[in-house]
Amino acid sequence: HYPLRRQRQMCIRDSNKIERPAVPLPIRLSAIDPICLDILYNRGIKTPVEMEEFLFPSLTKQLRAHPPLLDMDKAVSILKAVVANKEMVTIYHDYDVDGVTAGVTALSALSQLGVPVNHYCNDRITGGFGINAAGVDEIVAKFPDTKVLLTVDNGIAGIEGVSRAKELGLKVIITDHHEPGAKLPDADAVIDHKRVDESARQDKNCCGAGVVWKLMLELYIGLGRNVEPVMDLLDIVALGTIADVVPLIGDNRAIVQEGLKRINSGARPFFQMCLEVLEKESIDAMTVAFRIAPMINAVSRMGGDASKLIDLFMETNADDLRAGIIALDDINEARKEETRRETELAKELVGKAPVGAIVFNHESLQEGIVGIVAGQLKEEFSLPAVVLAKDKDGNWKGSARSPEGFMLKEALDQCAEYLISYGGHAKAAGLTVRAADLDKFKEKLTKLALEAAGDKGFEVAIPIDAVLGAQDYTEDMVRHLGILEPFGEGFRQPLFGLIADNITGVRYMGTEEQHVRYQDESGLQVIQWNKGDEAKARKAPPKKFVGYPGLNVFRGNTTVQFIAE
């Protein structure tokens, strides 16, 4: 059995005990705080050349490092004819951030070539994920002049939907990044870096927006056009890349670095208005991940029409943009409250000691936010979590999330006999369980999770990058850490251990004193959110913390803060 909240231990990876060898450094590296280089070294980025390529990636060089994706030539050939003949393309996109940004990417790039373009998105609740026959029929009815159907961030599992499109005489191009099944859809081109026959040299980490962006780039190059309009879309692609939690390495890191520059350049009115509404001076990867992306995802989660988001991204009127983004923020706040209620219900019904895997189903659950609830249960219990809501057919439809050490997609493959449909990755998946087989599914998944966990359970120790004293956290050190950005999946924000032997003051913050601030004699402030009650119960302030340093600017004065768990 696993307790409700296993205490996460402050530990240092074995690799962090390796001292970085003293070697001559290029000028750009020699100017960086050594702690940054130590972090890179102990994360496997060891040589000066590797460090420079990681910190200062060249997107052009990254793209040239691997061959074009399979069927890219076929797709480009079809789209060249579309451009020449001004044939209508309808984009079939997903309803999450990656799907929406992939839709914006394709629509913008094709529109600038004079192609008549429409876009279509399933309703999250009634239509489900990916191209299907009903969606194709609706497209043909709504956009009868459609000649080419372009899927973005979906399609690799859409055998039925693609078959229907072909029956109706449409050409179909699939661009996707999800895991394929044993059989590929019968499309005219299937672009997915996870195809089993793809090159081993291929970068297999791109999100849906990244895949279709590469197609648009190849199209412009093939047409002999200036590629700057495609490069201008990197801000949109960066948003999709960060939001879809794909590893920020390789192509993705270069895309996000360049994309964040463009986001903060002021070129796109949407992001300029985000700065105003969210009261931010700049937008980094963390702002995208925890503020902007959730607002966009909230629309479909709360039953809204995600296809309208594409129009908002392309809006230029300041008043309409402001109203639109404020509305997104309001929807997201409602989503947060609904998520809080449903997560509390789940924890109450699951109990304090779930075994193996959590499979939680309840008729009151809102289908649009089951993925978030699953993610919170996974974090709370450090176990694979599946959360299911009853669908219109009486079956159980929902989402799954998994901690390190449990390959979710592979586990679902072994449970396929109980599932009507499923798809996803190692850490996240969507699925529909046949009502009659729910108990069998729970039993099978729990058994697989117990086997994977073994005696030790799933890893919950915090990998600390360095342990420092309070006096070591200086303003210069914190500013230098910024060069390691962007942080995200595959390259998380550095975590530090803080040894604070000389706490001189404690102050409680918030309307209910729910937060606490410790003052070290060095001047360093240690902030813990929502830990006020724990702090009051202590006989003395803690001497060890885990977290990350940051800068606080108040009335023109800059101080260093340590944000602790």
Task: For every predicted segment, state its role.
Residues 137-205, 209, 213-222:
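Active-site cavity-forming subdomains of large catalytic enzyme subunits
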Residues 40, 150, 297, 481, ...:
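A residue-level signal for conserved active-site and pocket-lining positions in enzyme catalytic cores
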Residues 1-14:
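Single conserved hydrophobic/aromatic residue that forms the stacking wall/gate
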Residues 160-164, 358, 373-376, 476, ...:
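A short acidic, amphipathic alpha-helical/loop segment
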